[in-house]
Amino acid sequence: MTPSTASAPRASPVREQTTVAASAGRIFGLVLRYWYVIRSSWPRAAELIYWPLVQMLMWGFLQSYLAQASSFAAKAAGLFIGAVLLWDVLVRSQLGFSVAFLEEIWSRNLGHLMMSPLRPAEFIAALMAVSLIKLLVAMVPVAFLAYFFFGFNVLSLGFAFAAFFANLIIMSWSLGLVSTGVVLRWGLGAESFAWLIVFVFLPICCVYYPVATLPGWLQPVALALPPTYVFEGLRAIVLEGAFVGHLMVKALALNVVYFIAGSIAFAYFLRSARIHGTLVQMGE
């Protein structure tokens, strides 16, 4: 056989599956699957929008009432609405991450995914992307209605909004990693943990009031949480018109620690689930 007719050596199938392009393709395929599920069911999309809309309207009307009776509330116009919108960024992103994972269990598909070429890191990346998609589906209409009803434009915060958004998203992913890891290890008996974990932080993160409002012994706990700095930063902008950059730096530093800890926890729970055989029993 001449060199011109000799067939070129083909890459190993294993090597083909480990390329960056193959990894990106698996992530994109999983994200596309989740997107089709959302797009094909209007009740799912309506559910994503419902609670953020109700919260925004409730706090917005309360703020309008207080502004008529209090000079401080009039000065702080947009404080409650901004706080509830940012809080919902954290909540919707974490739930978007966790619920996408739970849907794999409910459909008894998790074991198939774990036996496929899909790597755990790729699965996590897909869940992160899906959480962003669900967040946009939920919050874009609500933010528009906040401007329509109350004249509050979240984009008027400028660069500060980008910093707030990024820090809350990273924190939501950290919570999502821990909550899904717990469900991996202990099964659907721990499902409520995935739904409730973010709300544990609501009174401690000082969403609607400053850190100084908390008891002295609880303030260090609040200051150890990244969202606290986000909401303190929001109050600084609304009340003083100043963007306090060092608050965002502290939030980012804490987020790095929490995200690494969440990743380690997820890897540990996944390994434990494989050892104890709970992966194949999910959904049964």
Regions flagged by a language model, labelled:
Residues T2-E284:
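Hydrophobic transmembrane alpha-helices and immediately adjacent juxtamembrane helices
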